[in-house]
Amino acid sequence: MASGNARIGKPAPDFKATAVVDGAFKEVKLSDYKGKYVVLFFYPLDFTFVCPTEIIAFSNRAEDFHKLGCEVLGVSVDSQFTHLAWINTPRKEGGLGPLNIPLLADVTRRLSEDYGVLKTDEGIAYRGLFIIDGKGVLRQITVNDLPVGRSVDEALRLVQAFQYTDEHGEGPCFASP
């Protein structure tokens, strides 16, 4: 795994990448989301088994994140063309179908390296999840081994907890979103 530049309490590594947004290609930069929280999650590859369940789960809950002033971005080492092909493949045929979140292409693997999730021997990303606050500061890092996905509810809970502590200082455990 690459060591990366992502550190809790420090500015999140900046990025610029081509994404598939609403079925079209668009350049996306971290600075586009200044003033908003960002949940940035990495997944290994398109057209795999666990990845679509996570991506669809985040997409289905995108509005819950938007209500918190938070955007969700998915990233893999696949190209924007592969992302679009996966999105254009119906869910019943192993595809994603239409999404409510952007998928970023990291074909150079720079984002995966910068965020420390690159599995260098395979050239793919571990399942990393990063929460970045509205000032661009990295607040949370989780990296899972390849077979285990992330919980959308836990990501929502963490965003709510960080937003609460931003406003009120330290707080209780925040058991649920």
UniProtKB/Swiss-Prot annotation:
Q: A Gene Ontology CC term for this entry?
A: cytosol
- Organism equals Pongo abelii
Q: Which GO terms describe its molecular function?
A: thioredoxin peroxidase activity
| Annotated InterPro entries | AhpC/TSA, Peroxiredoxin, Peroxiredoxin_AhpC-typ, Thioredoxin-like_sf, Thioredoxin_domain
E.C. no: 1.11.1.24
Q: Does the keyword Nucleotidyltransferase apply?
A: no
Description of post-translational modifications? The enzyme can be inactivated by further oxidation of the cysteine sulfenic acid (C(P)-SOH) to sulphinic acid (C(P)-SO2H) instead of its condensation to a disulfide bond. It can be reactivated by forming a transient disulfide bond with sulfiredoxin SRXN1, which reduces the cysteine sulfinic acid in an ATP- and Mg-dependent manner. Acetylation increases resistance to transition to high molecular-mass complexes. Deacetylated by HDAC6 which decreases reducing activity.
Quote the subcellular location field of this record. Answer: Cytoplasm
| Protein's UniProt name | Peroxiredoxin-2
Gene Ontology biological process terms from the UniProt entry: cell redox homeostasis; defense response to tumor cell; hydrogen peroxide catabolic process; leukocyte activation; regulation of apoptotic process; removal of superoxide radicals
Active site residues per record: 51
Q: One Pfam family, please name it.
A: AhpC-TSA
Q: Which residues carry this modification: N-acetylalanine?
A: 2
Similarity field: Belongs to the peroxiredoxin family. AhpC/Prx1 subfamily.
Catalytic activity of the protein: a hydroperoxide + [thioredoxin]-dithiol = an alcohol + [thioredoxin]-disulfide + H2O
